[in-house]
């Protein structure tokens, strides 16, 4: 991941109306807590990084009532502002789709510049048939019903929590921006 990829990703997310919050991995639970509305559901595999108020073993009723779904993304595609959401037994895909707000947790190190790089990452998973992945780009929008409608086939809002590795914070200490976030690795 380069500074250019990070900058491009953030610019594309902004173009799509997606909010981005950045911070170190150690602050993940706090950042998610600030981004998530009530009630919130999430997937168990990210439980160590989620605030206690996020239900990590949601029932169907919990999912129906949830305002926010919190998932991890396996990959981010900078050129499109897309995130790779895995369809797994933990329920990542439904938690990302059946809510008004989807909070996506993505490690900065998991950003790639473009789709050829994303397909290179996806190739072994597809060949092994070990993974189903959806590339999601921004909030749900459709014009199937006449005018543009948001939230008909997925979340109305998307919020990305972009996490830096702790080592990157130390390496970039002299390259901080005005808001105190590291400018690159």
Question: Where in the sequence are the language-model features?
Answer:
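The feature marks the mature, well-folded catalytic cores of soluble enzymes
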Residues: 1-185
């Amino acid at each position: 991941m380069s500074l250019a990829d990070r900058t491009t990703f953030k610019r594309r997310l902004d173009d799509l109306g997606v909010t981005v919050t950045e911070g170190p991995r150690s602050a993940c639970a706090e950042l998610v807590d600030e981004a998530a509305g009530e009630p919130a559901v999430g997937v168990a595999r990210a439980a160590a990084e989620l605030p206690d108020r996020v239900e990590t073993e949601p029932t169907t009723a919990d999912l129906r009532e949830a305002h926010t779904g919190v998932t991890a993304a396996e990959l981010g595609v900078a050129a499109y502002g897309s995130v790779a959401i895995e369809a797994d037994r933990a329920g990542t895909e439904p938690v990302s789709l059946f809510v008004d707000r989807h909070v996506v947790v993505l490690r900065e190190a998991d950003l790639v510049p473009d789709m050829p790089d994303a397909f290179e990452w996806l190739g072994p998973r597809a060949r092994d048939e070990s993974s189903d992945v959806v590339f999601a780009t921004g909030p749900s929008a459709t014009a199937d019903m006449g005018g543009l409608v948001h939230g008909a086939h997925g979340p109305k809002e998307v919020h990305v929590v972009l996490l830096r590795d702790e080592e990157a914070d130390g390496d970039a200490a002299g390259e901080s921006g005005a808001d105190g976030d590291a400018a690159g690795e």
